[in-house]
A protein has these predicted regions:
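Conserved N-proximal alpha/beta basic substrate-recognition cap immediately N-terminal to
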Residues: 42-135, 384, 389-390, 403, ...
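Peripheral (often C-terminal) accessory segments that flank ATP-dependent C-N-forming ligase machineries
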Residues: 323-431
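Domain-scale detector for complete catalytic domains at protein termini or as standalone homologs
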Residues: 3-74
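Short beta->alpha connector loops
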Residues: 9-15, 33-34, 87, 136-139, ...
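Structural motif
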Residues: 5-6, 79-80, 222
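Short, well-ordered beta-strand elements within core beta-sheets of diverse protein domains
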Residues: 169, 199, 250, 311, ...
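Active-site nucleotide/adenylate-binding loops and adjacent lid/helix of ATP-dependent enzymes
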Residues: 114-196, 201-202, 213-214, 250-264, ...
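ATP-dependent carboxylate/phosphate-activation module, predominantly the ATP-grasp catalytic core
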Residues: 175, 199-275, 279, 286, ...
Length: 431
């Protein structure tokens, strides 16, 4: 008989929480203010947990310390701390260092968040990645001069502990580099003001989602962005033709050699961070000469449309698969249900207030469309400044390649999100 465990789950995720509770284990839930204010917390699930702690955020050490102290006072044994978002990764690492009997090295948790330490570890493992330098203070003129003399332009400037492409800028010249830093904009969600600067890498941008149990993949799915993320985001100013924002999953049987290379690549990346049992996303580039270049990794799935896209591919909510795998090591999903899967995120041509969205029922009725997810609504203001600003997501899924391609092409060409500058009105149709 499997021994009953006590699990500490950080943040709200319905499907994952449900799977953990259905396993018969005790689940202690830690929620932050964002969870309470923005998620529909289901009382029936909440009532099944051992108890719930509330913290202001997972960056608040005093709140997390109080949670750990209460657990210690109860003399409870916590078998596993589970975190699935970047917003809770550092806090979860801190908690497990205080409440788990044999905690993982806290620096391992930091290394999958801080991009400077991340790339240092990857380089030490012999994996190619962009040359990069730390910029702890954007106003440090001496350090900036050193960076300009050392790195080859263009370069990418981004927060060392950022989220996706928030506050990420490309500088093509030393002069542009200085101009960006003289007036650097930090998105509100970016917690640290320290930056990293790295040389720009060209090529096809890939993403790899995996669940690892005892060092082996329970699922391993690779995809390719329609356009490199920075190029897509950079085209949103309205001054140039807008590039599509989306991705397609790559079938293993059609890309067997690439999958073999990616599996070896990700095993080496995991080893650099001592990852054996975790969910991971690895982003990388395939250069024009075919070389794989590491970009970033995290111990969570990709954001935005990645979770529903992978779920569509595997035929069930991916959090159910992850929950089973992390608990029992037996999570192998069923055979791929949808062979061809992808997504696009429709955004307005220019920043502003949304005045019209494509009709959901009409888009959903297109053969090859699996799901329509209008993240934003009419009246919302979009800055279009980073890739985590999702607007109108369409998930595609089909066993027929022609149907799949036709659906993606039709949605991207026939349907549009319309916006106007703040303070104006417009009733233009979204189609």
């Amino acid at each position: 008989m499997t021994q009953r465990k006590t699990l500490l789950l950080c943040k709200w995720e319905h499907d994952l929480l449900e799977t953990l509770l259905d396993s018969g284990n005790d689940v202690i839930l830690v929620l932050d203010d964002f969870d309470a204010e923005h998620h529909h917390l289901e009382p029936k699930l909440i009532d099944r947990t051992a108890r719930v702690y509330r913290v202001s955020s997972f960056d608040a050490l005093s709140d997390l310390s109080a949670v750990a102290a209460d657990i210690r006072l109860r003399e409870e044994k916590i078998d596993q701390v589970i975190s699935f978002t970047e917003f809770s990764q550092l806090g979860a690492g801190y908690l497990q260092s205080l409440v788990v009997e044999q905690p993982k090295d806290l620096l391992d948790w930091v290394a999958v968040r801080d991009k400077r330490l991340m790339k240092e570890r990857v380089r030490a493992a012999g994996i190619r990645t962009a040359i990069s330098l730390s910029l702890p203070d954007s106003g440090d003129r001496e350090r900036r001069e050193y960076i300009k003399k050392t790195l080859r332009f263009p370069v990418v400037v981004k927060p060392a502990l950022g989220f996706g492409t928030m506050s990420t800028r490309r500088a093509d010249t030393p002069e542009q580099f200085d101009a960006i830093l003289d007036d650097f904009h930090y998105e509100p969600l970016v917690p640290s003001r320290q930056l990293t600067v790295e040389e720009f890498v060209t090529g096809r941008e890939l993403l790899v989602e995996g669940l690892w149990v005892n060092g082996e993949p329970e699922f391993f799915v690779a995809g390719s962005y329609l356009e490199p993320r920075l190029a897509s985001i950079g085209s949103r100013s309205g001054d140039t033709e807008q590039l599509p924002d989306g991705a397609v999953l790559l079938l293993r049987e059609e890309n067997a050699q690439l999958y073999e290379r990616l599996l070896d690549f990700c095993r080496r990346v995991n080893a650099a961070f001592h990852v054996t049992d975790a969910v991971t996303e690895v982003e990388l580039f395939e250069t024009p000469d075919g070389e794989l270049v590491f970009s970033e990794m995290c111990t969570r799935l990709g954001g935005g449309a990645v979770v529903p896209m992978v779920s569509e591919h595997l035929g069930e909510p991916v959090w159910h698969i992850i929950g089973r795998g992390l608990l029992s090591g037996e999570a192998r999903p069923r055979e791929v249900v949808r062979r061809y899967v992808g997504f696009v995120n429709l955004v307005p041509e220019k920043p502003g207030v949304i005045t019209s969205l494509p009709p959901v029922d009409e888009v959903a009725a297109i053969p090859g469309v699996a799901r329509v997810w209008p993240v934003a609504k009419v009246g919302d203001a979009l800055s279009l400044s980073h890739g985590a600003e999702f607007c109108y997501i369409v998930i595609f899924g089909s066993d027929d390649r022609d149907e799949f391609d036709a659906a993606m092409e039709r949605v991207m060409t026939e349907y549009h999100v319309v916006s106007t500058p703040a303070g104006t009105a417009d009733s233009t149709s979204a189609r």
